[in-house]
């Protein structure tokens, strides 16, 4: 056995070099990348401020900090007072300027323009300040033929008076009904001679006017003009046409009955209309005709009725 001991080679131990270790660590680690910013979001610093060039904000001195806008009222009121004082006298002279002309406008059928001018001249003073416009309007509208009045001042010295007359639709008692169904009393009733005559209770005036307009529209296309319409206390209707033919309608279904009459008129009555004196449409499924006495249609009807009666009498009877 060899007495020689095993020889262990020397091992060189070196102290760790911090630079080398740092280099090794750096080579193995992946570089850190900044977080990706989504579109639409601004990059901010940890303090919450935007990145970029910042300019220091320098507070500007406020030279108007002492100013209070309410102070403007003082010089404004002073200016208005001074201006009003100097303008009062010229304005007063302008307002007191006397009229040089009065213009009367409107369509005149029942009241003459001369009559309107006369009513106006009685109310006009020498200047605008003393003119009572409301009293002038009342004076004009008190005339039953005047519906409305409009007054306008046309500077510097002209008064424009616009007058709208009443529009009579039908006669009613000692006056007429206007387009609103109002009863207007007038003295010159003869000036309404060409209008239809409506009769009934005053409380039913609007309804009667509406019924007249509906019936007139239905009959006018066939040359049948309504000259009178009456509604009695039982609300029974009766009308008179231009050739003095009276039609008894009754209390209910007025338009339905008259439409049935129009149908019969178109098919049977049109050709013998001059021989008809009266018609009764109060039946549920027809109408009755009263002929003018002695007319050809009346004679023909009487002959036909007599023949029918004789045929009935001579007909054989069966046991």
UniProtKB/Swiss-Prot annotation:
TM ranges are: 71-87
Q: Which residues lie on this side of the membrane: Cytoplasmic?
A: 1-70
- Residues on Periplasmic side: 88-319
GO BP, sorted A to Z:
cell septum assembly; FtsZ-dependent cytokinesis
Q: Which GO terms describe its cellular component?
A: cell division site; plasma membrane
Bias type Basic and acidic residues, positions? 27-52
Quaternary structure note: Part of a complex composed of FtsB, FtsL and FtsQ.
What PANTHER family has UniProt attached to this entry? CELL DIVISION PROTEIN FTSQ
Query: What is the role of the protein in this entry?
Result: Essential cell division protein. May link together the upstream cell division proteins, which are predominantly cytoplasmic, with the downstream cell division proteins, which are predominantly periplasmic. May control correct divisome assembly.
Q: What is this protein called?
A: Cell division protein FtsQ
Q: Which species is this UniProt entry from?
A: Cellvibrio japonicus (strain Ueda107)
